[in-house]
Amino acid sequence: MEDFARGAASPGPSRPGLVPVSIIGAEDEDFENELETNSEEQNSQFQSLEQVKRRPAHLMALLQHVALQFEPGPLLCCLHADMLGSLGPKEAKKAFLDFYHSFLEKTAVLRVPVPPNVAFELDRTRADLISEDVQRRFVQEVVQSQQVAVGRQLEDFRSKRLMGMTPWEQELAQLEAWVGRDRASYEARERHVAERLLMHLEEMQHTISTDEEKSAAVVNAIGLYMRHLGVRTKSGDKKSGRNFFRKKVMGNRRSDEPAKTKKGLSSILDAARWNRGEPQVPDFRHLKAEVDAEKPGATDRKGGVGMPSRDRNIGAPGQDTPGVSLHPLSLDSPDREPGADAPLELGDSSPQGPMSLESLAPPESTDEGAETESPEPGDEGEPGRSGLELEPEEPPGWRELVPPDTLHSLPKSQVKRQEVISELLVTEAAHVRMLRVLHDLFFQPMAECLFFPLEELQNIFPSLDELIEVHSLFLDRLMKRRQESGYLIEEIGDVLLARFDGAEGSWFQKISSRFCSRQSFALEQLKAKQRKDPRFCAFVQEAESRPRCRRLQLKDMIPTEMQRLTKYPLLLQSIGQNTEEPTEREKVELAAECCREILHHVNQAVRDMEDLLRLKDYQRRLDLSHLRQSSDPMLSEFKNLDITKKKLVHEGPLTWRVTKDKAVEVHVLLLDDLLLLLQRQDERLLLKSHSRTLTPTPDGKTMLRPVLRLTSAMTREVATDHKAFYVLFTWDQEAQIYELVAQTVSERKNWCALITETAGSLKVPAPASRPKPRPSPSSTREPLLSSSENGNGGRETSPADARTERILSDLLPFCRPGPEGQLAATALRKVLSLKQLLFPAEEDNGAGPPRDGDGVPGGGPLSPARTQEIQENLLSLEETMKQLEELEEEFCRLRPLLSQLGGNSVPQPGCT
């Protein structure tokens, strides 16, 4: 009977109008309760994550339960992955970095289990270099791996809810009573309940975990996703409300909330990432800031704009605007890059929806909207701002001030040109204002309060005063040209060239490179200081809360200079494309090219500094104990190896095949003159030699060293494995061959090209004296081991390959950089020079006899100066002839080997 009842009750809810037959007796009370329980569970909002994540209040109850009972990382990871999927390609690529640092990085507070293949790829490739498709695939695989944990958490919540042990059950029951009423009212009430639950969770933050850092990370992650759903978060707006994520249009949002469709999303776990424990910060204090000659004092600060500009919305900066936006879409739109070929018409207002829900918004929402539109009280002392203030519902000022007839007569390209010029001016003013905020609210107070030594503070904010001066002067020139031209700028090329070309451009490139290259170091230093010094942490939070910061954090302001440099080429390119006059167009295009060169130089400086920081981290973890204990004389000079003094060319994981039965996973560093094979052991990086035999020989000839000099290195593809390659080199007359295996064929090609290029760029100085003739390679050392002995993965080696390897080992001693230039041509020039010295009166095309008394033999003595010059030329000629003799000897030994390689074992005649 019970089985039958279960079968009858198993389908979903019965259709209206049909009354099921009751077949349960009075004695089956427990079974009846079970049926009611199953029915309640079927109607629950917590059957799957897809259902609950559309209900902010229900999701908050689930999140609180999971945060207090489980590890919340998997659930938060899935939610933030869903948020990533709602972004456009460009925004998603940037947001993936925050997702990586929050959930995938090894030091992340909320790190989740990562599939091995994804973890391997992330270890070998920087997150910012991964393509969009691969990023999407990684996120999908990570989310898929979290489904079991999330399903277990949902199951636990459902079972606890049936027993009345889940939080906020009464509030959820009251909310569910509103289902079926007016949709707008229900959604407003749902958001209100979610806000209350979120506020309560923030108040009980300290109970989530004993680790305060983790508790803050969990609360910030939850708050970020709630803002994504349209729930207002007071603490999030003040501390972590950033605009790293930016949605073009909320696909499933309500059409009657226009403000929510443009709402920016924050960087994942801003406060958590800011306070998260990181590896030891490299000591940069020895990198003293360069001291330059004092330049004239900064001009009057003009043009600080009180309106939000697109420049502040690029990259990290951003704002939440819960109220109705009054500005045209084109100035604040996150969907368009500045300087695009077809900028939006600024006169077009953004679509506005009905205002039926305006009364449901909290009272402070209007104030927040007004804060972003009007000048702030903290911005006084910046004259010239009013010239750029725009009316909230009107297009830029140049349209108003240009006569209507002139405006209507302008061609479309000219209108676009004026729009981009106006955008250049407005965003430049916003950038100047941001730099002044950095100086006035952070740099200067830090110096006065002695939070950092002055030298270290100058490394955190290098050349900040000079940058303010340069950008302010550029803004003043743009403002002046705008006023002189009556707000319709015809010629701007000379102003642009004066800023980006010549000496001024070089100075701008120097100070911007200095500032941008230190930004990673600055962020690390500030994080470390905030983590250790509560007084400094309070100072930063107080400064960030000021109106002038516009809810931006310090870590969001530091990268603004780099972001600004990326916009100049785009803006200037757009101006040039819409300029018809050839001379003016040429000037603008030249200025755009100068901007690209400056950006390229700055990017290179940033990469070099990042490489230096990475080398410092590797140096800190480098374990040289094996080298110091080794008796190998070849390794004696590397016992105190300092890789920070070298240049990092490339790095990545490879497999080192020592023998056919032994392979070692190594992290390879290609430096400017060395190739290092590092073995990871916990956090340490070992430089360890390996023997090709079970018992190393006393002379060390069977040892493969982890340090390879590149002066004589060359690469060769392994014929039987397209992912593998050989690195062959000679070291003090000893030739060795290493077999390394990459993950893909393209990686193998890249490694071979970089090693060959780096080795080819090294120059060996010519010997000061004639070296001794090289003995035959076979007479001084054992033959170079074949590919199978050095590790061929158990593959069979053909006789032809073995023969090739043997001949190749004999050829290795000859693989060294040749002398610069051609020796024969040099010797001939020396002979002609001596001829001119001995016979100065003889013309190049003449063959007559020399005159008496001109210093020729038999005609009189030579002058002392000429005698000295002739002697030097003779010595140089003698050295050149010795080098030619050495080359001839080497060639004679090389010809038989080349004959064998070509299949002819008979040596060619002509060498004795």
UniProtKB/Swiss-Prot annotation:
<feature type="compositionally biased region" description="Low complexity">
    <location>
        <begin position="777"/>
        <end position="789"/>
    </location>
</feature>
<dbReference type="GO" id="GO:0005085">
    <property type="term" value="F:guanyl-nucleotide exchange factor activity"/>
</dbReference>
<dbReference type="GO" id="GO:0007186">
    <property type="term" value="P:G protein-coupled receptor signaling pathway"/>
</dbReference>
<dbReference type="InterPro" id="IPR037887">
    <property type="entry name" value="p115RhoGEF_RGS"/>
</dbReference>
<dbReference type="GO" id="GO:0001664">
    <property type="term" value="F:G protein-coupled receptor binding"/>
</dbReference>
<dbReference type="InterPro" id="IPR015212">
    <property type="entry name" value="RGS-like_dom"/>
</dbReference>
<comment type="function">
    <text>Seems to play a role in the regulation of RhoA GTPase by guanine nucleotide-binding alpha-12 (GNA12) and alpha-13 (GNA13) subunits. Acts as a GTPase-activating protein (GAP) for GNA12 and GNA13, and as guanine nucleotide exchange factor (GEF) for RhoA GTPase. Activated G alpha 13/GNA13 stimulates the RhoGEF activity through interaction with the RGS-like domain. This GEF activity is inhibited by binding to activated GNA12. Mediates angiotensin-2-induced RhoA activation.</text>
</comment>
<feature type="region of interest" description="Disordered">
    <location>
        <begin position="763"/>
        <end position="802"/>
    </location>
</feature>
<keyword id="KW-0963">Cytoplasm</keyword>
<feature type="modified residue" description="Phosphoserine">
    <location>
        <position position="374"/>
    </location>
</feature>
<dbReference type="InterPro" id="IPR036305">
    <property type="entry name" value="RGS_sf"/>
</dbReference>
<dbReference type="InterPro" id="IPR041020">
    <property type="entry name" value="PH_16"/>
</dbReference>
<keyword id="KW-0175">Coiled coil</keyword>
<feature type="region of interest" description="Disordered">
    <location>
        <begin position="841"/>
        <end position="865"/>
    </location>
</feature>
<dbReference type="GO" id="GO:0160221">
    <property type="term" value="P:Rho-activating G protein-coupled receptor signaling pathway"/>
</dbReference>
<feature type="domain" description="DH">
    <location>
        <begin position="416"/>
        <end position="605"/>
    </location>
</feature>
<dbReference type="Pfam" id="PF17838">
    <property type="entry name" value="PH_16"/>
</dbReference>
<dbReference type="GO" id="GO:0005096">
    <property type="term" value="F:GTPase activator activity"/>
</dbReference>
<feature type="domain" description="PH">
    <location>
        <begin position="647"/>
        <end position="760"/>
    </location>
</feature>
<dbReference type="InterPro" id="IPR000219">
    <property type="entry name" value="DH_dom"/>
</dbReference>
<feature type="modified residue" description="Phosphoserine">
    <location>
        <position position="409"/>
    </location>
</feature>
<dbReference type="GO" id="GO:0003723">
    <property type="term" value="F:RNA binding"/>
</dbReference>
<dbReference type="InterPro" id="IPR011993">
    <property type="entry name" value="PH-like_dom_sf"/>
</dbReference>
<dbReference type="InterPro" id="IPR001849">
    <property type="entry name" value="PH_domain"/>
</dbReference>
<keyword id="KW-0597">Phosphoprotein</keyword>
<comment type="subunit">
    <text>Interacts with RHOA, GNA12 and GNA13. Homooligomerizes through the coiled coil region. May interact with CCPG1. Interacts with CTNNAL1.</text>
</comment>
<feature type="compositionally biased region" description="Basic and acidic residues">
    <location>
        <begin position="283"/>
        <end position="313"/>
    </location>
</feature>
<dbReference type="GO" id="GO:0007266">
    <property type="term" value="P:Rho protein signal transduction"/>
</dbReference>
<feature type="region of interest" description="Disordered">
    <location>
        <begin position="248"/>
        <end position="413"/>
    </location>
</feature>
<feature type="modified residue" description="Phosphoserine">
    <location>
        <position position="863"/>
    </location>
</feature>
<feature type="modified residue" description="Phosphothreonine">
    <location>
        <position position="695"/>
    </location>
</feature>
<dbReference type="GO" id="GO:0005886">
    <property type="term" value="C:plasma membrane"/>
</dbReference>
<dbReference type="GO" id="GO:0005737">
    <property type="term" value="C:cytoplasm"/>
</dbReference>
<feature type="modified residue" description="Phosphotyrosine; by JAK2">
    <location>
        <position position="738"/>
    </location>
</feature>
<dbReference type="GO" id="GO:0005829">
    <property type="term" value="C:cytosol"/>
</dbReference>
<dbReference type="Pfam" id="PF09128">
    <property type="entry name" value="RGS-like"/>
</dbReference>
<keyword id="KW-0472">Membrane</keyword>
<keyword id="KW-0343">GTPase activation</keyword>
<feature type="coiled-coil region">
    <location>
        <begin position="865"/>
        <end position="896"/>
    </location>
</feature>
<keyword id="KW-0344">Guanine-nucleotide releasing factor</keyword>
<feature type="domain" description="RGSL">
    <location>
        <begin position="41"/>
        <end position="232"/>
    </location>
</feature>
<feature type="compositionally biased region" description="Acidic residues">
    <location>
        <begin position="365"/>
        <end position="381"/>
    </location>
</feature>
